[in-house]
């Protein structure tokens, strides 16, 4: 039985109708794995950075009617929350596992963090071909960096700067049948490799 890896059964949780039913399924089927990933990668980040990280599992506490379409664990250097800081996330939708690092629009000093990405612009463009950007964390769509022109990528960063609701993340995704999800060892290796790349933009 997998401790970390998301299985076909986990993805089917997002087919459960109704808020109460889906939340119950998320809590029983997915959150134990998010907790395990939270422990493992908190230690990983604490080892690979000079800072102390904390894991935050999504609670979806504000929802009253609509069931969540995704869920995640986030990592930040604040024990109380993550939205106000640049942070890492591991999570899933019904047909996608995602891993990403960046800033939400709620982030304090958001422009400073966007400038860090801008300083590493060449490195962003030269990431492996399966890396993506995410400019809205509530949307599943994450275009591949290799499919964007230099001007389009610069415009995404510019919009994150200028718009109050602007956001910017570097991301990587897996489909439910990806070979990296066959075993815990393969999944952890994939995540560690991804975090190694994402840490280039952590400052």
From Swiss-Prot:
SUPFAM superfamilies: YktB/PF0168-like
Family that this chain belongs to: Belongs to the UPF0637 family.
Protein name as catalogued: UPF0637 protein Sca_0732
Organism: Staphylococcus carnosus (strain TM300)
Taxonomic lineage: Bacteria, Bacillati, Bacillota, Bacilli, Bacillales
């Amino acid at each position: 039985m997998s401790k970390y890896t998301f299985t076909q059964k986990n993805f089917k949780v997002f087919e459960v109708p109704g808020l109460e039913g889906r939340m119950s399924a998320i809590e029983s089927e997915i959150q134990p794995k998010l907790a395990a990933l939270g422990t493992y990668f908190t230690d990983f980040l604490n080892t690979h950075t000079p800072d102390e990280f904390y894991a935050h599992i999504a609670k979806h506490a504000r929802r009253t009617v609509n069931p969540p379409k995704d869920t995640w664990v986030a990592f930040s250097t604040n024990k109380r929350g993550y939205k106000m800081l640049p942070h890492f996330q591991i999570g899933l939708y019904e047909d996608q596992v995602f891993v990403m690092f960046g800033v939400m629009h709620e982030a304090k000093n958001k422009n400073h963090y966007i400038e860090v990405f801008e300083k590493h612009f060449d490195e962003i463009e030269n990431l492996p071909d399966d890396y993506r950007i995410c400019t809205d964390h509530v949307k599943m769509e994450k275009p591949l960096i290799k499919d964007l022109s230099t001007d389009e990528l610069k415009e995404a960063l510019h919009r994150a700067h200028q718009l109050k609701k602007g956001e910017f993340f570097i991301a990587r995704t897996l489909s439910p049948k990806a070979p990296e999800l066959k075993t815990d060892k393969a999944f952890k290796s994939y995540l560690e490799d991804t975090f190694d790349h994402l840490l280039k933009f952590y400052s």
